[in-house]
Design a protein with these regions (language model features):
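Short helix-terminating capping/connector loops at secondary-structure junctions
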Residues: 133-134, 209-217, 483-486, 507, ...
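Short acidic/histidine-rich active-site segments
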Residues: 322-327
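Juxtamembrane cytosolic interface motif at the C-terminal end of transmembrane helices
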Residues: 13-18, 93
Length: 595
């Protein structure tokens, strides 16, 4: 029905100065620290191409670890991301689900059971850090996994007596509502802190250096892709605040990031900013896989550049650096663009946006690994050449300031929107006019008669139109040739929210603001209704400017909007009642111009 146009909007408040905390003023030599929107080492700007590296779990990966890190350094990589966690065993653990289980064997866990630590895994991590040091690489350590590949959150919960968080009926085998208990359960929090302390306070058996004193470490990632369903974000945020403070109490010098997937809506963006604004969080983190993450709408290299700009602007609005911790693309490419073209767009956009680091998934000795880039096969020679080129680009732009457009506080507030516009004077958009006995003009619109719409997701058809997230629908009352006294304009609309799929009843209201010819006429909280009763929102507009336009016979543009700062930004569904039922006398939208 509509021609969809992808539109981008912008971000938040840019702070020109961020006072460094006390622990950053005395960072020892060689440590990476955050300074405003960039990283620095010994006073010099530090930007990087980075890699997730397969060195921890499979026997062949562990054996090839020294070679993998050497090859990473040869490709110009400066930071590698390593998993410093693994819980449970093949025999009694929560195992990975899906087709890549072979990539995540549980032969070398860090912790077999709550009181059964595996020193051999820690010693291997010692060797990883020693080899990284030898190759002038920094290492980012990920301390636990939301997903089941390494045991992770669901294994901790099982140890706490909560078995139903691991459930094959859910995506990736994790019941998110039950897995949220990890953040609040006293036992899981204690077990996590025990693991953190063993990592941070460990003395490397190869180098003799305490991890907390080792400049080889880039920093700590609290969790891989920490999740929280809509409406339960505060539980995750409190956990991140607690654990980041705990790590800083043990190690004041290394960087900390929460380890979140990112955001895909204006609502999620707010929470992403709130988490990354916590005092012990040093930098922001985002992941993206265009083929798999369809809600990111990254369906072209150009869309990827827009995605990166938006996240960079969000990070800069709180004056912190941004790292893309994972980006993946399979060898066969996507949407007509080759793998190497996707990676070139990724690195170029990140470099020119002022991103601190751009990492990829995953450098591996295994040519068969999904999303893997291998140094063992000629297949990836072109990709490895791209890594070298990108590393040079990041080096050349080390001292470049972020683009001014990404520091504009009024832009980039919405990740992405889709829009439609009808042609002027489209007959299909004109309402039915009824003149009442008291000479009141009554205009009736069907939902699908909107002349314009713009939302984060968007659809419509006979008897309905809906938009998710923030945005608007507009309807136009046609101009008249007569003039008439107008005491008020009454607007009625059958409005409901469009809750996120994971809200589970926690997003059953949306804040809708009515504008008439640009004048704010007030907001209503529209709730999810339950049959058989329709709930109609009603505005009695006595504002002078809309009444003046109605008196002069001007066209009246009605905008039903969910604003970017709305307390309940959960879209608009305008429909006949019952929903999906098209009946001639239903009244989803009415406008009365009263004398």
């Amino acid at each position: 029905m509509y021609a969809a146009l992808a539109l981008m909007f912008g971000a938040a408040i840019y702070l020109s100065v961020r006072a460094p905390s006390a622990h950053l003023r005395s960072v020892p030599p060689g440590f990476v620290r955050a300074s405003g929107t960039r990283f620095v080492v010994d006073g010099r700007a530090f930007r990087f191409v980075g890699a997730n590296v397969a060195v921890m779990y499979k026997d062949e990966d562990r054996a090839a670890m020294p070679e993998t890190l050497r090859e990473a350094a040869l490709d110009g990589i400066k930071v590698v991301r390593v998993w410093a966690s693994g819980e449970g065993t093949e025999e009694n653990g929560v195992l990975s689900v899906g087709g890549d289980r072979a990539d995540w064997p549980r032969k070398h866990p860090f912790r077999r059971a709550p009181d059964d630590w595996n020193e051999e895994a820690f010693v291997h991590l010692d060797h990883v850090l020693a080899e990284a040091r030898r190759n002038n690489l920094h290492v980012q350590l990920c301390l636990v996994n939301w997903w089941r590949d390494t045991g992770g959150v669901t294994q901790y919960l099982r140890w706490a007596g909560i078995d139903d968080a691991a459930d094959e009926h859910y995506k990736f085998g994790v019941n998110p509502e039950r897995a949220m208990l990890f953040y609040t359960n006293e036992t899981t929090r204690r077990l996590y802190r025990e693991h953190v302390a063993r990592i941070v306070m460990r003395r490397n058996t190869v180098t003799g250096i305490l991890y907390r004193d080792d400049p080889t470490l880039f920093g700590y990632e609290l969790m891989n892709e920490a999740q929280a369903p809509t409406g339960r974000e505060a539980e995750r945020r409190a956990w991140i605040e607690e654990m980041s403070a705990y790590i800083k109490s043990l190690d004041a010098n290394h960087l900390i990031t929460p380890g979140m997937w990112g955001y895909r809506s204006a609502y999620e963006r707010r929470e992403w900013l709130a988490v990354h604004s916590l005092p012990n969080i040093d930098y922001c983190d985002v992941h993206n896989y265009p083929r798999d993450d369809l809600d990111s709408f990254v369906d072209s290299p150009a869309a990827l550049r827009e995605f990166i700009d938006n996240r960079a602007a969000a990070a800069f609005s709180i004056n912190k650096p941004l790292v893309f911790g994972e980006f993946g693309m399979s060898p066969d490419g996507y949407k007509g663009a080759a793998q190497v073209d996707w990676f070139r767009a990724y690195f170029d956009a990140a470099a020119h946006a002022g991103v601190g680091g751009a990492m990829f998934w995953i450098l591996t000795p295994d040519p068969q690994r999904g999303y893997g880039i291998t140094y063992k096969d000629v297949r990836d020679e072109q990709m490895r050449a791209e890594l070298v080129r990108a590393a040079g680009l990041f080096n050349s732009l080390s001292n470049a300031a972020p683009p001014a457009a990404l520091l504009n506080a009024g832009q980039h507030l919405i990740p992405r929107q889709f829009a439609f516009t009808r042609a002027p004077n489209d007959e299909a958009a004109k309402p039915v006019l009824k003149i009442q006995t008291d000479n009141t003009l009554l205009y009736r619109f069907a939902p699908e008669q909107a002349v314009r719409g713009r939302f984060e997701k968007l659809d419509g058809g006979d008897g309905y139109v809906w938009g998710a997230g923030v945005g608007f629908f507009e309807y136009v009352v046609p101009a008249r040739t007569d003039r008439r006294r107008v005491s008020e304009i009454v607007v009625r609309a059958h409005l409901q929210p469009v809750p996120p799929h994971d809200a589970d009843g926690r997003a059953d209201e949306t804040r809708v603001t009515l504008f008439i010819n640009g004048t704010n006429c007030g907001a209503k909280l529209a709730a999810m209704e339950h049959q058989p009763n329709a709930v109609i929102q009603e505005w009695h507009v006595k504002n002078l400017i809309p009444r003046y336009h109605a008196w002069r016979g001007h066209a009246l543009t009605l905008r039903f909007a969910v604003e970017t700062d709305a307390d309940r930004p959960f879209g608009i569904n305008i429909s006949n009642f019952p929903e999906w039922f098209h009946a001639g006398e239903t009244k989803p939208i009415e406008v009365e111009v009263r004398r």
